[in-house]
Amino acid sequence: MPRSHPIEDYRNFGIMAHIDAGKTTTTERILYYSGKSHKIGEVHDGAATMDWMEQEQERGITITSAATTTFWNGRRLNIIDTPGHVDFTIEVERSLRVLDGAVCVLDGNQGVEPQTETVWRQADKYNVPRIVFVNKMDKIGADFYRCVEDIKTKVGGRPVCIQLPIGSEADFKGIIDLVRMKAVVWEDEALGAKYHDEEIPDDLKEKAIHYRNLLVEAAVELDDDAMTAYLEGVEPDEALLKLLIRKAVRQITFIPVLCGSAFKNKGVQPLLDAVVDYLPTPIDREAIKGVDVNTGEETVRLPSDSEPFSMLAFKIMDDPFVGSITFARVYSGKIESGTSVVNSTKDKKERIGRMLLMHANNREDIKEAYAGDIVALAGLKETRTGDTLCDVNKPVILERMEFPEPVIEIAIEPKSKADQEKLGIALSKLAAEDPSFRVSTDQESGQTILKGMGELHLDIKVDILKRTYKVDANIGAPQVAYREKLMRRVEIDETHKKQTGGTGQFARVKMIFEPNEAAAGNAFESNIVGGAVPKEYIPGVEKGLYSVLNSGVLAGFPVVDVKATLIDGAFHEVDSSVLAFEICSRAATRRALKEGGSVLLEPIMKVEVTTPEEYTGSVMGDLLGRRGQVQGQDMRGNAVVINAMVPLANMFGYVNQLRSFSQGRANYSMQFDHYEQVPANEAAKVQAKYA
């Protein structure tokens, strides 16, 4: 069956914003006016169609990006709803990665807020073309022109108004469309579905002409012929002006700014028109790059149905009715349900079973998907976020998504045996859905450790465990992953002898222990010649070594980067055994760690703080107070970026501290960089706490 809409009619876009800017309400209205949602859901009463997880409805924040397909003026819109909280920036990055464009929603009262700055920078990183919708124009204190100024000063964008508001706060009635030079007014009683054109009010004519001139001047810069005509007194007509604005958006030359009030049902239809008129289609964007699996060389996949099939998985969710659902974007070719494909990232075969088009959390089964489609796949076994699925005969790995290392960990203990079983299943599903959430087991205590991007991130995971999976558990305090290291080369000669009547135990080992290169890991080798220690006992020596290295002598943390060499030993025909050599090796390793001068290591994080200039001094002083070493600073747009190396132990609670002294305008990212020796006074505190 041929595709129902040509790829030129596709708009894959996301709606990004600060928490509470009205992003979910805007999406709701888009779905309502484009006919996909029969009742308008309000975030205020926890019923918005897009916010479909309980945790989101309760907190009124959007956590997961739900993908929705709808239609407007014959065009197919695939909308990705992105979260607006700083602990979920991984979700935002993940959705920006597969978008062709974005609508940035601002609160008309607040302007560009801290999370807007973060998301804007992420959109810059992926070169996502965007338009801005200044929302909440009905709110007390709403100021459209201040928001436009904010785009210049806070995120370094070049805003160009294509609409102006008519009135504001309680008197907000409609908009002036500067492209058509008409006023558009909404009729209140029709839930915003009815609106009409009028002439521009007399008191706004002068302002409209001024901003129209700014728009035309910015647009004609993009075309020599249009510029020449304009200088000769001929303005571009509506069709050409739209074409030039579209070009500006595609090249991110300037950012068109629109306005309205989604909650009061004003301005949403012209926003949809702007999405269709100005945001790029899949073929307007650069072809996606990848690596040809067969040759190892870089290749590109064009957004065409005739190219070999390739798609990128960008989100995994556990659906209570369908099971595991993988959201993916088809970049090239076409795919039918029932087809076998290869997961080239993992080199595993997958079969495409059910394919679904998602509308928030309603779903429609489809048989084929084409280049440009965003679909949900049910029943994939091996695929994780960031994996490529492609044609078995033309394998390619598309650009990999990079996910930051988790920086905070907590211990979790199920309260009963039944909870223990449920916990294992639930955690494996949560880890598959979210690559920035990791699960591991503490070797010493046997505790399950959860690792994530921030305190809210882990709070929400624990909440999901309790609500969705009904797991009852105790939660520990956040911890740092320390390590221990041997400092000097030592030679140890150890004998283990035990005689208790009957068969005794006997083993002797002579071993050299020395520091290995940083990050080289632990290593064991045997240089035994002449059978001083028979071959069958050597695994016992290795096992004894590693059992001690898993829990060091200082404070019970894993020992890293040790090389141990077995050079000699002795055995007894009757009394020696694998166990005897294991016990002997354990004793030798403990002695070596004490005599060789073990030290504690701590994780050092590479911290990048982005802050408005006026808070630079406070940020630097605070980092130094956290035992940080500032590596340098530079300007990005109009913000200062400070790079520093800081021990993780001193970074707990940092996000709240940073928010408080920067009024929430500074933000930071951090990732693990290396391990470094803990200063003696700090090491004593750690040992007292853990030993």
Swiss-Prot record:
<dbReference type="InterPro" id="IPR014721">
    <property type="entry name" value="Ribsml_uS5_D2-typ_fold_subgr"/>
</dbReference>
<dbReference type="InterPro" id="IPR005517">
    <property type="entry name" value="Transl_elong_EFG/EF2_IV"/>
</dbReference>
<dbReference type="InterPro" id="IPR031157">
    <property type="entry name" value="G_TR_CS"/>
</dbReference>
<dbReference type="InterPro" id="IPR047872">
    <property type="entry name" value="EFG_IV"/>
</dbReference>
<dbReference type="InterPro" id="IPR020568">
    <property type="entry name" value="Ribosomal_Su5_D2-typ_SF"/>
</dbReference>
<feature type="binding site">
    <location>
        <begin position="135"/>
        <end position="138"/>
    </location>
    <ligand>
        <name>GTP</name>
    </ligand>
</feature>
<dbReference type="InterPro" id="IPR035647">
    <property type="entry name" value="EFG_III/V"/>
</dbReference>
<dbReference type="GO" id="GO:0005525">
    <property type="term" value="F:GTP binding"/>
</dbReference>
<dbReference type="InterPro" id="IPR009022">
    <property type="entry name" value="EFG_III"/>
</dbReference>
<comment type="function">
    <text>Catalyzes the GTP-dependent ribosomal translocation step during translation elongation. During this step, the ribosome changes from the pre-translocational (PRE) to the post-translocational (POST) state as the newly formed A-site-bound peptidyl-tRNA and P-site-bound deacylated tRNA move to the P and E sites, respectively. Catalyzes the coordinated movement of the two tRNA molecules, the mRNA and conformational changes in the ribosome.</text>
</comment>
<dbReference type="GO" id="GO:0005737">
    <property type="term" value="C:cytoplasm"/>
</dbReference>
<dbReference type="Pfam" id="PF14492">
    <property type="entry name" value="EFG_III"/>
</dbReference>
<dbReference type="InterPro" id="IPR035649">
    <property type="entry name" value="EFG_V"/>
</dbReference>
<protein>
    <recommendedName>
        <fullName>Elongation factor G</fullName>
    </recommendedName>
</protein>
<dbReference type="InterPro" id="IPR009000">
    <property type="entry name" value="Transl_B-barrel_sf"/>
</dbReference>
<dbReference type="InterPro" id="IPR053905">
    <property type="entry name" value="EF-G-like_DII"/>
</dbReference>
<dbReference type="InterPro" id="IPR041095">
    <property type="entry name" value="EFG_II"/>
</dbReference>
<dbReference type="InterPro" id="IPR027417">
    <property type="entry name" value="P-loop_NTPase"/>
</dbReference>
<dbReference type="InterPro" id="IPR005225">
    <property type="entry name" value="Small_GTP-bd"/>
</dbReference>
<dbReference type="GO" id="GO:0003746">
    <property type="term" value="F:translation elongation factor activity"/>
</dbReference>
<comment type="similarity">
    <text>Belongs to the TRAFAC class translation factor GTPase superfamily. Classic translation factor GTPase family. EF-G/EF-2 subfamily.</text>
</comment>
<keyword id="KW-0547">Nucleotide-binding</keyword>
<dbReference type="InterPro" id="IPR004540">
    <property type="entry name" value="Transl_elong_EFG/EF2"/>
</dbReference>
<feature type="binding site">
    <location>
        <begin position="81"/>
        <end position="85"/>
    </location>
    <ligand>
        <name>GTP</name>
    </ligand>
</feature>
<dbReference type="Pfam" id="PF00009">
    <property type="entry name" value="GTP_EFTU"/>
</dbReference>
<keyword id="KW-0251">Elongation factor</keyword>
<dbReference type="GO" id="GO:0003924">
    <property type="term" value="F:GTPase activity"/>
</dbReference>
<dbReference type="GO" id="GO:0032790">
    <property type="term" value="P:ribosome disassembly"/>
</dbReference>
<dbReference type="InterPro" id="IPR000640">
    <property type="entry name" value="EFG_V-like"/>
</dbReference>
<dbReference type="InterPro" id="IPR000795">
    <property type="entry name" value="T_Tr_GTP-bd_dom"/>
</dbReference>
<keyword id="KW-0963">Cytoplasm</keyword>
<feature type="binding site">
    <location>
        <begin position="17"/>
        <end position="24"/>
    </location>
    <ligand>
        <name>GTP</name>
    </ligand>
</feature>
<feature type="domain" description="tr-type G">
    <location>
        <begin position="8"/>
        <end position="283"/>
    </location>
</feature>
<dbReference type="Pfam" id="PF22042">
    <property type="entry name" value="EF-G_D2"/>
</dbReference>
<keyword id="KW-0648">Protein biosynthesis</keyword>
<keyword id="KW-0342">GTP-binding</keyword>
<dbReference type="Pfam" id="PF03764">
    <property type="entry name" value="EFG_IV"/>
</dbReference>
<dbReference type="Pfam" id="PF00679">
    <property type="entry name" value="EFG_C"/>
</dbReference>
